[in-house]
Structures are given as C-alpha cells and as structure tokens.
C-alpha cells in the first residue's frame, strides 16, 4: 500500500513548500546589501566590472524573496515577477555599458523599466564571486577530483594596512628645529606622522616616519627640499597591499593523483551536467595522456589563463587563436560554453546564502535561466 505522501501531486507539494517559505520574515534592502558584502566583498571585483546594486526601487524597500539567476533575460524576468521576487541577484550584470536613455526600444532597457515598475531591486556580484574563496572558480574546481588549489592571479587586500600608499622617512639632528618640522608635517592633510629616537652617524637624532598619499607626498617633499640636509637623508618606500592567498581570479589546481584526460573529461561532464563539451588536444597529447595540473577560469578564460603552465585549461570560452597557442605548447583545452561553467554554482550559492541570512528570507533559483548556445 502506498503512503499518503506519494499520493500528493507535485504541484500541490510545490504550493505547500511555497506557502511555508513565504512565512519567513523580511530584510531591509540596506541590511541585505551589507550582509551580501560581508559574504563576498565587492572590492574583489575587477576594476572594469559593473557590480553591486544596479537597480534600486524608491526607499524604503524590504526583501522577502531573493531570486538567483546567472543571466537576467526577459524570460527570466517574467519568472522572477511571477514568483513575486523583491530582489534579483544576477551573476552577470544586466547593465554593463552606460545607458543614454531608458525606453522600450532594447531588451536591457525593458528589464530596467520592468524592475522599477514592479519594485524589484537588481544586484550583480560577477567577478567578486569569481575571486571569492567560496566562489564560482572554487566550485568549478570541485569537479576535478581531490586537489589543492590557489588563485592564478591573487587579489590584494582591499585596504592599505596604514593610511596612504607611501612611507617617507628622514632624520632630524639636534641643530634642527624638530618642533617646526613636526608642526608643518601635521598641518598637511592626509598624513600620519610618528617619531622615535635613533642613532645615526654616531649622534643622537630623531627619526621621522610618515605615511601619505601620492598627492601629499609631493607637498611633503616640497617642504623638505627647503632644507638640504633633511632632503638628502629622505627615504621613500612604496606600500603595497598584501596578497590574499585564497582570493583571486582563476584557479591553478594540482590533483593528488594524476588521471587520464579521458577520465578528466567525464568528471567535468558529470560536474557540469553536460553531455558534450569541446576539446582541443595539445600537440603530442592523446585521450590517455595524464593530467596532473589544471588551470581553470569560469566564463571567458583567455586572458586569465594566458601563459599559465598546466596540463589542461578548463574554461567556458577562449578565442580561436588562444586555443591554438595553448595547444602548440602541449596544453589540452576544454571549452564548455561561457555560462555552463558558472550556472551550477548558483545551487551551492542558494544553500550558502540561506545559512548566511539565517533563513530570514526566501531564496529561489531560476528554472528558465540557461546558456543561449545548444549543441544540435
């Protein structure tokens, strides 16, 4: 005899699930944005990218349902509105190039109009999620098998450890007016000044150290140049933001155990749920050639992977000539189409955000979002 659970139609189960989810509380838009930045800082996005809140309804705006998609198309927007979304997180920014007008003439302008008319916020993390330790590239690497990974191009810390990008140091001897020097330096905006005793050239002196910006550096040097002794003993150091070991673009993955290219292909197909992918064999390689090191980049990996030493490049798309260049070096190349290397991450993101937001809001995944290219 079948249990009653098996007799409930799927549509009814979905409706019941929707009712349960809809009972959750709301989040204020500003609080949600702050929490999203805590999850993965937008400061890690590439400088050319357009990330963050792209469409904002008039305040106040509260969010009950967050809708996840890889690409915000007109079909996906229809789905988001049908599911009463208040906030769309679109991995790819639907607004990238500047818009000179908002009319019904182009599909992207229509998206903006529909979002505003229906009070739906639109947000894109894009390359910030590529760089994140728990982001898209790290998810893509999970399909390779047990391996150690590191970013191909590590990100730098978002802020300098101290104020300013330059450190300037010099010594003041007893014959010079220390108070005047310190007073003048502290009068320059954007400068952090410290002093400490030091012994230089056999005499007791005061060592002055200050951090400053490029602009204030020129002001400080103009002052010091008035005293030849001070100016000639001045040292300038450039301060760099420290590299972050687990954050950055692309991933270089070293497998614990080498596998044949044929086995690696099947692993990637399984992980991405693809029946086909595109393969360029490296010169002198076969399907039985061993793969130990994989360099990967979700989406378009040509610039990120260029010049990286590996047995295999894995990405969504590369230019014809980049593929030829890699193959000439004996590097195998696997292309899976751009968004096929990204979209699967959203299921994992849905779970992570649920935990991050302590299940305060509904988080749903688009069912209509798909890569525009198909193998026919």
Curated annotation (Swiss-Prot):
The modification N6-acetyllysine is found at residue 108. Its main location: cytoplasm. It is found in: Cytoplasm; Nucleus. GO terms for biological process: negative regulation of transcription by RNA polymerase II; neuron differentiation; positive regulation of DNA-templated transcription. Disulfide bonds: none annotated. The modification Phosphothreonine is found at residue 254. Ubiquitous. Detected in all tissues tested with higher expression in cerebellum, heart and kidney and to a lower level in cerebrum, lung, liver, spleen and muscle. GO terms for cellular component: cytoplasm; mitochondrion; nucleus. It holds the Pfam family DUF34_NIF3. Residues 243-376 are annotated as: Mediates interaction with COPS2. The modification Phosphoserine is found at residue 258. Keywords: Acetylation, Cytoplasm, Nucleus, Phosphoprotein. InterPro entries: DUF34/NIF3, DUF34/NIF3_animal, DUF34/NIF3_sf. Gene3D superfamilies: NIF3 (NGG1p interacting factor 3)-like. GO terms for molecular function: identical protein binding; RNA polymerase II-specific DNA-binding transcription factor binding. Homodimer. Interacts with COPS2. Interacts with THOC7. May function as a transcriptional corepressor through its interaction with COPS2, negatively regulating the expression of genes involved in neuronal differentiation. Belongs to the GTP cyclohydrolase I type 2/NIF3 family. This is NIF3-like protein 1.
């Amino acid at each position: 005899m079948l249990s009653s659970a098996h007799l409930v139609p799927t549509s009814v189960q979905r409706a019941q699930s929707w009712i349960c989810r809809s009972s959750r509380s709301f989040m204020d838009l500003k609080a949600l944005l702050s929490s999203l930045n805590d999850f993965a800082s937008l400061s890690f996005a590439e400088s050319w990218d357009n990330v963050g809140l792209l469409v904002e309804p008039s305040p106040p705006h509260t969010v009950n349902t967050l809708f996840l998609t890889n690409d915000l198309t007109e079909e996906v927007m229809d789905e988001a509105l049908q599911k009463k979304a208040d906030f769309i997180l679109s991995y790819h920014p639907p607004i990238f190039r500047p818009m000179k007008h908002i009319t019904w003439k182009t599909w992207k302008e229509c998206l903006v109009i529909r979002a505003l008319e229906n009070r739906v916020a639109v947000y894109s993390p894009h390359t910030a999620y590529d760089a994140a330790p728990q982001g898209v590239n790290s998810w893509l690497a999970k399909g390779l098998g047990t391996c150690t990974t590191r970013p191909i191009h590590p990100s730098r810390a978002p802020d300098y450890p101290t104020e300013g990008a330059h450190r300037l140091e010099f010594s003041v001897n007893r014959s010079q007016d220390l108070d005047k020097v310190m007073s003048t330096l502290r009068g320059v905006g954007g400068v952090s000044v410290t002093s400490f005793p030091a012994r230089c050239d056999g005499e007791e002196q005061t060592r002055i150290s200050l951090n400053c910006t490029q602009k204030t550096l020129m002001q400080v040097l103009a002052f010091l140049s008035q005293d030849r002794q001070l100016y000639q003993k001045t040292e300038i150091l450039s301060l760099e933001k420290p590299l972050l070991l687990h954050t950055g673009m692309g991933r270089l993955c070293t497998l614990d155990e080498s596998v044949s290219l044929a086995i690696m292909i099947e692993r990637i197909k399984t992980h991405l749920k693809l029946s086909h992918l595109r393969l360029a064999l490296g010169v002198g390689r076969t399907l039985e050639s061993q793969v130990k090191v994989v360099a990967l980049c979700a989406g378009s990996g040509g610039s990120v992977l260029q010049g990286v030493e590996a047995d295999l490049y894995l990405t969504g798309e590369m230019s014809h000539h980049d593929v030829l260049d890699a193959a000439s070096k004996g590097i195998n190349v696997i292309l899976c189409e751009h968004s096929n290397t990204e979209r699967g991450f959203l299921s994992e993101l849905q779970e992570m955000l649920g935990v991050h937001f302590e299940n305060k809001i509904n988080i749903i995944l688009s069912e209509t979002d798909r890569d525009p290219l198909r193998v026919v």
